């Protein structure tokens, strides 16, 4: 860390640290007199605790204010001073002290307040951070910059009084501009979702009861214990996959948001605010690296595009082609193929504050045919930027729609990636684990898996036609229909799943019994309370994205269910293991059932509603899902080693827009993620055939009707019988794939 940090903390908190033995009587008397003088006037209070006492208070004792606690604090501080070196005590203090904004330790504080590592902190910045322990909220530089500056001046004054810095260093520090900002999301932002989920699980685990069971004698519990106990926590997160998942979800949500239309600028600036933007902007071309977004102010607009001010003399230009998506929102019109904007004046106005990113650049490449130069597209290079030449930009807009992505290794249950929303800084609500939404058709594999155990086969006949169900208890009538609002008649079971036909699924659930479907759902590990309602066969039950993703693992892993693992182990600061989650399997259904389901779900991706989830060169199986009124879009897909679930929807229930189904909205996000990480797994190009199964001859691909289905006139369900094999012994799997 920067040498200014320990020096600043010592000046602010305990300048005689290297002279006392854990307790400083002089400091206690000084604080008592200071507080007595300020009590009547309501002024600030001063603490007399040494750094050693503060460590004892934070790591071992509760935060109660009492003479008994202060006495314990003093005794333990004295003992600590005689067993641990001064340097180690100071190092521990700097690594564990709470500094506001969920930041513990100087490294976290440096990242939070100045967007840099502790090793890069200046004297002026060190004084700001060192001023925080007394009242992290009151001196928070984001919320109270004036108070933070005053506290910084106090710390710098102490350094000067102690002659630890020169007058020149003091003057330079007090005049140094302070720019407060946190490390942006694209630098470690995706991991915050995972770490916050792990933190939440830790707080839930370390209850007073569990601490007693573990034999831990402490007055702290929950969050207070987690932050101060010096725990070593191992998680199942794969940083490469976590970053890929975050980028994939952000890309998919931004694409959906653009299909929904332009909601307007961030703000309409007054002339005075434009002047302030121009003067205070800290823009540098490097800010646009990695497809990052920055703010800009529109300075001129015509039909062909808009000129914008970026700051520090740099300008940009947004051609109308780079804002062609920015139509007026209209949920009744599909964003797929909507008319493009052709006049920039219909989108932007002068003094609009907007978000922009650098447009890709077309450059010459090697090769070319028939005398034509070859070109390629590359990312913006800040080294090419100049104040004399506008930077070509893209108009951007932060999505309102949210989503989640969870990825689980099928054999271990390791949750290798977990993204809970578009941007962690906007909301810490983790939609992957905390949201409960209806999965729609992505629940259907539970029904089909049940049907396979009740005598149905992939070639069994099922009717896609009108279905009427009267609830015997309420007399309510339910008439489910298909998304396309049509019926296709009798079809084989595998085609009904491939095309996600609702009436076929309901008939299957009615035939095998909804209680058996619920039993299968629970065996797969699904956690909701399931009402005995036929509608749950179409996903009319709320479930979390991680829970649904985990349920699909059995289809990829020979019928073995697996418990998800986020935290794999916890050890204390003495190396004692406090918790370990071993791999936990159970037989959710037979390996034969799993093989058939995996094969059926491959067909959904190869030629059905999940075609946008295909990853070139890799075998993917999965199922799309869309809830009523296109409120929620899902895709859950897997290979033999990894299952990934994607959910997209608004936090407040509303339609995603016309034609925004799981196959169009969620499946591409799956592909963006899996195309980046698929090579990490050495999966074979197929799913292993299980004993007890045999390929069965069926009619060829031109199958138009099956005559061997008998329909129950009371229920409308079809009864499977042996399929007609007169069409020849074609291999079913070859027909499907």
Report the location of each language-model feature.
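Active-site SXXK
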Residues: 9-10, 159, 245, 303, ...
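Mid-domain, small-residue-enriched loop/turn segments at the edges of structured enzyme/sensor domains
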Residues: 476-479, 513-550, 566
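Short, glycine/proline-biased beta-turn/loop segments that scaffold the active-site neighborhood
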Residues: 177, 348-359, 368-371, 377-380, ...
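Non-catalytic, structured segments within soluble enzyme domains
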Residues: 16-19, 42-295, 299-314, 508, ...
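A penicillin-recognizing enzyme superfamily signal
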Residues: 4, 235, 239-242, 246-248, ...
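Short, well-structured active-site flanking segments
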Residues: 18-28, 104-107, 166-170, 376, ...
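Conserved catalytic neighborhood of penicillin-recognizing serine enzymes
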Residues: 34-65, 119, 184-190, 194, ...
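Active-site loop and adjoining helix of the penicillin-binding protein/serine DD-peptidase-beta-lactamase fold
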Residues: 77, 81, 133-151, 161, ...
